[in-house]
Swiss-Prot record:
Keywords: Disulfide bond, Glycoprotein, Hydrolase, Protease, Secreted, Serine protease, Signal, Zymogen. GO terms for molecular function: serine-type endopeptidase activity. Its EC number is 3.4.21.39. It comes from Papio hamadryas. The keyword Iron does not apply. It holds the Pfam family Trypsin. The active site is at H66 (charge relay system), D110 (charge relay system), S203 (charge relay system). The keyword Cytoplasm does not apply. The gene is CMA1. This is Chymase. Major secreted protease of mast cells with suspected roles in vasoactive peptide generation, extracellular matrix degradation, and regulation of gland secretion. It comes from the Eukaryota.
Length: 247
C-alpha cells in the first residue's frame, strides 16, 4: 500500500488515509482529558488543517511529525472547539522539533515536539500526560484509548466535541498489509472485526494505555477499517529527553 504525506492525500485518495478521526466512539466527559491539545496549523501552501496532540510539559506538546506547518496555535482546556470557554488556553508554538529521520514516504519516525511560547497554566482542565520509558514495550492484547475531534465516520464531518474510543493493541501481523509497518517503531492498533478506529483529521493524538501515552496516531486505511498505525513512543524516549533537556 502506497503511503503519502498528508498534503498529498487528496490527490491520491485511492492509496491510503491519515489516521486521527474517532469512529465508533463516544463523547468524553468535558475536561476529563486535560492533557489533550487541539492544533490549528497553517501549512506552507496556505490552507489550514488541524491535528491533535498532548501536553507533556508545561511548555511542550507531543504530536505527529506530519502535523508540521508554517505556524501552529495550540488550544488547551477545550472540549467543544466551536465554543470558547474560560478554561481555554491558546498558545503559540515558537519551535517545531520534527524527528530528524521522519520519512514522508514510509511515515517512519512520525513524531514531533512543539515548544510553546509561554508555559501553560496547570488547572483542572489543563494538565500533563506521562509517557513511557525507553524499555516500556507495551504488549499486544492490551486495551487502550484514543481521543480526538475528528470525523465520526468516513463521510461524516468532524466532531465539535472531544470523542474517545477504546481500541485493542494487535499483533504485528495484523498490520502486514501496510508495506512499511515496523513493529519496533510503531504499534498496530484496532481489532479488524470491529468498526472502531482512528481515522484521518486529528492525527497526533495520544494512545493511552493504563494512564500512560504509549502511541501517537499516525495513519490508517482510507475506508477507516482497523487496524491503524501509531508511532511507538517508547522507542523515541532518548530523543524526547534530549530535546527537553536542551530547551
Amino acid at each position: 500500500m502506497l503511503l503519502l504525506p498528508l498534503p498529498l492525500l487528496l490527490l491520491f485518495l485511492c492509496s491510503r488515509a491519515e489516521a486521527g478521526e474517532i469512529i465508533g466512539g463516544t463523547e468524553c466527559k468535558p475536561h476529563s482529558r486535560p492533557y489533550m491539545a487541539y492544533l490549528e496549523i497553517v501549512t506552507s501552501n496556505g490552507p489550514s488543517k488541524s491535528c491533535g496532540g498532548f501536553l507533556i510539559r508545561r511548555n511542550f506538546v507531543l504530536t505527529a511529525a506530519h502535523c508540521a506547518g508554517r505556524s501552529i496555535t495550540v488550544t488547551l482546556g477545550a472540549h467543544n472547539i466551536t465554543e470558547k470557554e474560560d478554561t481555554w488556553q491558546e498558545l503559540e508554538v515558537i519551535k517545531q522539533f520534527r524527528h530528524p529521520k521522519y520519512n514522508t514516504s514510509t511515515l517512519h519516525h512520525d513524531i514531533m515536539l512543539l515548544k510553546l511560547k509561554e508555559k501553560a497554566s496547570l488547572t483542572l482542565a489543563v494538565g500533563t500526560l506521562p509517557f513511557p520509558s525507553q524499555f516500556n514495550f507495551v504488549p499486544p492484547g492490551r486495551m487502550c484509548r484514543v481521543a480526538g475531534w475528528g470525523r465520526t465516520g468516513v463521510l461524516k464531518p468532524g466532531s465539535d466535541t472531544l470523542q474517545e474510543v477504546k481500541l485493542r493493541l494487535m499483533d504485528p501481523q495484523a498490520c502486514s498489509h501496510f508495506r512499511y509497518f515496523d513493529h519496533n517503531l510503531q504499534l498496530c492498533v484496532g481489532n479488524p472485526r470491529k468498526t472502531k478506529s482512528a481515522f484521518k483529521g486529528d492525527s497526533g493524538g495520544p494512545l493511552l494505555c493504563a494512564g500512560v501515552a504509549q502511541g501517537i496516531v499516525s495513519y490508517g486505511r482510507l475506508d477507516a477499517k482497523p487496524p491503524a498505525v501509531f508511532t511507538r513512543i517508547s522507542h523515541y524516549r532518548p530523543w524526547i529527553n534530549k530535546i527537553l533537556q536542551a530547551n
